[in-house]
């Protein structure tokens, strides 16, 4: 290998490694420097949510697929943020995506916010609660009509309130 090629490959490798490290530090969920109407200390969130929901809502984690009982929730009602109670999705927009996570084709108006998530190096659109900033999941462009969107949510980030 020639010195020029060796230097190029070394610098290219460093660039990929640097991008990976920066991407893994990218804010997801409540970690970004945004201000939301509902705020608590980390200790207060931990106490309120418990370890599993805290890891998702406040640290941007993901639950195991097919682990949420909300996958099988088919009653009429509202899915709200477990962190602050903000109504997020109507059961009318829930659909079976066969991905293992509760999925919706549209949020309620002004319920969510979105930002680019580069944690896995491939940019994705992260979805968070507009009221508390809690990480909810991601949105993809492979959903059903009328929006063509799949809001793929972590069940541990949600609570269901039946209609009535």
Protein language model features and the residues they cover:
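C-terminal segment of N-terminal export signals and the immediately downstream linker at the start
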Residues: 23-56, 64
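N-terminal post-signal-peptidase region of extra-cytosolic proteins
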Residues: 59-74
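Mid-length scaffold segments of soluble, non-membrane domains
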Residues: 72-103
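Residues immediately within or flanking Cys/His clusters that coordinate Zn2+
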Residues: 78, 126, 149
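Short cysteine-rich clusters marking metal-coordination/redox-active sites
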Residues: 81, 129-132
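Cys/His-coordinated zinc-binding microdomains
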Residues: 85, 133, 153-156
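Short, non-ligating residues that shape and space the ligands of small metal-coordination modules
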Residues: 90-91, 138-139, 161
């Amino acid at each position: 290998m020639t010195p020029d090629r060796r230097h190029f490959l070394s610098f290219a490798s460093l660039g990929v490694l640097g991008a990976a490290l920066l991407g893994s530090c990218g804010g997801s969920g409540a970690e970004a420097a945004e201000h939301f109407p509902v705020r608590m200390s980390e200790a207060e969130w931990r106490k309120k949510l418990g370890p599993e929901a805290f890891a998702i809502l406040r640290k941007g984690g993901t639950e195991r697929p097919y682990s949420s009982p909300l996958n099988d929730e088919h009653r009429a009602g509202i899915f709200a943020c477990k962190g602050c109670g903000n109504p997020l999705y109507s059961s009318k927009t829930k659909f079976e995506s066969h991905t293992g996570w509760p999925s919706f084709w549209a949020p309620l108006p002004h319920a969510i916010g979105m930002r680019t998530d580069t944690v896995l190096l491939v940019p994705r659109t992260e979805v968070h609660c507009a009221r508390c900033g809690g990480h909810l999941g991601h949105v993809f462009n492979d959903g059903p009509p009328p929006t063509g969107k799949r809001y793929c949510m972590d069940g541990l980030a949600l609570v269901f309130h039946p209609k009535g």
